[in-house]
Curated annotation (Swiss-Prot):
Organism this protein belongs to: Buchnera aphidicola subsp. Baizongia pistaciae (strain Bp)
Official protein name in the record: High frequency lysogenization protein HflD homolog
Superkingdom, natural source: Bacteria
Compartments it resides in: Cytoplasm; Cell membrane
Family designation: Belongs to the HflD family.
Topology term for the membrane: Peripheral membrane protein
Amino acid sequence: MGKNFYSIMLSLAGICQSIVLVNQLSETGECHSKSFEICIDSMLNLYPTTVLSIYGNKEKNLKLGITTLMSLLNVNAILKCKNSIKMIRYIFNLITLENRLENNIKYKNILFKELSILIQQHKNRVYTYDLLADRLAQIYLDTVSKLGFRIQVSGSKKVLHNIVIQNKIRCILLSGIRATMLWKQIGGRRYQFVFYRNSIFHYADMILKKINDTKYS
């Protein structure tokens, strides 16, 4: 059970890393660049051996997601942060989208096929992260956007009218759906946010302390 909670925590951190990047992009047009690249990389590994392997086998690659997860599991922190409710809404919207994708064989297969093609092309040519983001955004439009449910991203109207930002947000939402798939595959369920909040918080806190340890690399 301990190992399972660890994996569940990591997958939730992956989800949270995605939604906090979406929030940053929608508000300012910018986001934590390293975490953005990690989210893109997470979609280029279709056959992971573990949850952590999707994120470069380094817990520190999920630091932003872990800190966000901890804040969303802390009732007092939620009340103090105006964006917390919005990010919680994004999480449950991602769960809804993932459910729709899982039940739609056509678009699920298209998504897998398009990602496989992109991965092979990337191996042959090595795309930049900007180009990968554009390609992943198009895959999102070709699949997830056709599921009949859309995540309403709120933020700066000026920023959200920028096509480059729109593509980055779609790309990151796709990585959030991927993380949600992982979360469900390893036993993640909605009720855990209520009944196992403390256990998940404990594992997140433990890993964050290890990441922040100067001896940890």
